[in-house]
Amino acid sequence: MSTIPNDLKYTKSHEWIRLEADGTLTVGVTDHAQAALGDVVFLELPEAGRVVSAGEACAVIESVKAASDIYAPVAGEVIARNDSVTDAPESVNADAYAAWLFKLKPANAGDTSALLDAAGYATEIAD
């Protein structure tokens, strides 16, 4: 059974989103996603300053099984990326919720209302 923290938001494409006090968003992949992928061996993250649209493929995660796109949960500007996970991609498997990938400044703060809560994501992955 996958871990699904209640204090995060989620997408149907298996990204988790933490709403920070300053209005920015921290993005990573869910425990469910890392378990399905298997051993993560490579990450390609967006550069700071990149402007992304909601749902745009903006990063790549590769495992021994597959390569998958990571999507921007909302429109905005990438303000930081976690280079420590590119140096140690296995950290995503060790703790998917500590191994954040990038931070976004949303173009519109209200855009997060379309994201799933923990119960909604649990229902989504139960199918």
From Swiss-Prot:
GO annotations of cellular component type: cytosol; glycine cleavage complex
Gene Ontology BP terms: glycine decarboxylation via glycine cleavage system
InterPro entries: 2-oxoA_DH_lipoyl-BS, Biotin_lipoyl, GCV_H, GCV_H/Fam206, GCV_H_sub, Single_hybrid_motif
CDD domains: GCS_H (cd06848)
Residue span(s) of domain Lipoyl-binding: 24-105
SUPFAM superfamilies: Single hybrid motif (SSF51230)
Keywords annotated in UniProt: Lipoyl
Pfam families from the UniProt entry: GCV_H
Manner of cofactor binding, per the entry note: Binds 1 lipoyl cofactor covalently.
Residues modified as N6-lipoyllysine: 65
Assembly and binders: The glycine cleavage system is composed of four proteins: P, T, L and H.
Function description: The glycine cleavage system catalyzes the degradation of glycine. The H protein shuttles the methylamine group of glycine from the P protein to the T protein.
Protein's UniProt name: Glycine cleavage system H protein
The organism of origin for this protein: Azoarcus sp. (strain BH72)
